Amino acid sequence: MCIRDRSSTNGVMTAVANDETAIGYISLGSLSNDVKAVTVGGVEASAETVKDGSYVLSRPFNIVTNGDATDPVAVDFIAYVLSKDGQAIATDNGYIGEDGADFTSAQPEGKIVVGGSSSVSPLMEKLIEAYKTVNPNAELELQTTDSTTGVSGALEGTYTIGMASRELKDSEVEGGAKAAVLALDGIAVVVNPGNTTDDLTVDQIKGIYTGELTTWADVQ
């Protein structure tokens, strides 16, 4: 059994797809036929099961700023992604969004940089594309790195808006980081398509990642 725990979503999927003994976890919204998602406790990962709580593995997709956003484009864009229109895009792409409020752009001009989590990035790319049709005056650059870089980049000014696929750490909040939940994401536990394992319990997943279970025979 080989645990694939990489900072890149694509890196995890590639590694699992090429190793019949591998296991990893990725964003539900990034799931493809290259890997197989196992059920957890007999429950399939889906937007519906995450929302109703029957699928227990989920995480927030956070947008992060250094304190309250002040850049006009950032303020307008954040309002958009949290609006009814932005949340509908999240829902349409397999994530769990909220109802959101109506949105009217203030049409600010300027450039912002959004960067961070590779799990959040596919959804953010779609949101940026949609926002540009609403406000063509704005320029938004997307940089895909990881959650920790997303938070530190927002605090240091490298990014106007950071992306993190986790809760903020106490030290990050104490440093001035402020988060808003963009959407809720199911965490898909994935194995190679050739693996005959179809279901794992939460305890088995914990055992795999703590090293208590080291072969697939241990979970049969």
What are the language-model segments listed below?
Residues R4-Q220:
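Exported/periplasmic ABC-transporter solute-binding proteins
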